[in-house]
């Protein structure tokens, strides 16, 4: 079997051998053991499930929250002749059904699934008929409430295990503290503890913390001093645009990226940066997951992340090609105050959460004992003006209410329109009195999408506009008029956040926030922030050693390239110089060192 793994690696990827602990993980999961693999960014995680998936009978199901990564990996696997597909929110019901049926009948070897899809009745019904070899859980730290990126949807993975008893799980993550490592194995119901850990040390990456009152000037100075592709991380969407404009004014090509942009715009900017058409990407933490660009020379954090896990993962996007790269954190005295304030912003007092829940019911005129299943568009700005709240507090309260089971809050809708024909294909051809724009849009829809007669289907209005030789606005009005004539069902794309009540409304004072949702998570959040502050202020210990220790990895050697190590080296040279002066071995005249002769 071991030789089979290597022959698969060579046949499909062209690599002569495995790296690091890849083979250990592959052999472990292939033998049927639940396995947790800890590998740093760029460590080759995907190989550890793709190779054994091809070596075994059945289908490997890969659970990941990263839709961009899904699409990218499926594309690359298909280019290698490997049967792969994915299920995610952008796909229509009929497309998902087709993918699942293909999987059942052998047309798919590796199936990527977003965690939100696991709970759907359709997926669970079809899953019973799929021969599963093993289940891979990517970004496994998301299942841990002690992790920095907990996602409630990940808890459903344990339910899938009950449907497929005896099927082993491979959990993978690039960021997990010892506490999170234990929690992952417990939450995924590992039959026994089984962890393989690759060193998180990045020998080609120099970690630098630089104290700077004027961070923008320091950022420009650094980018002018060190060439190559770069990512600038900031906390707010507004600042991404400001930083990109500032850099452009300085002659440094830059663009910006955040979760609020249209999908087409995000895709366009990401591709421009990946192709080096622009040098710098200014972004929030919405950018970077699943992005394959190995030659990033520098990651600069203008704003301090709220955990070392987040910092390590974002900084780790530099230098994935093994070449010398830099991770720079710009820090000053104001950052500590901002980080401390984030605790209060992220965990408002329970009384305030209850008040916001109550006012939400007034806002939508929902009576006690009603509302379950209802969805409402949510204008947070209007809500805050009426009830005199800060948006950050409202946003945090809604997330806590979501984790407590009262509602579902989506602040970043997908922004794509959906269409379904209400007439049969033959009836469409008999239609008369269609305007030229309506006729062009109907023709473009029929050419581009095969599922429009059976289900609501996501459409690309820009593509339809190109095919119909119309503007996007003309396409929109044509779709609206077709819907008014009951020819199609049309759900316009919406960027407005929405709220769905997952249970009937109760009195605000009866809202119960569980301890694990508020007290326990707040305590862990405070600990992570304190660790981040300590890292930024600790200028006596090697940066790499500090990071490795946080993730439970002991390392006696220093990196010799971070700001602390370089400062210590200068101190050592100065001490040596002073000693020689004291011992009368050298003299200093006009700042020149002159060695004394015997």
Model-identified regions with their sequence ranges:
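C-terminal accessory region of SF2 helicases/translocases
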Residues: 278, 295-296, 304-313, 319-598
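Helicase motor core with emphasis on the C-terminal RecA-like subdomain
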Residues: 2-12, 16-20, 24-46, 52-57, ...
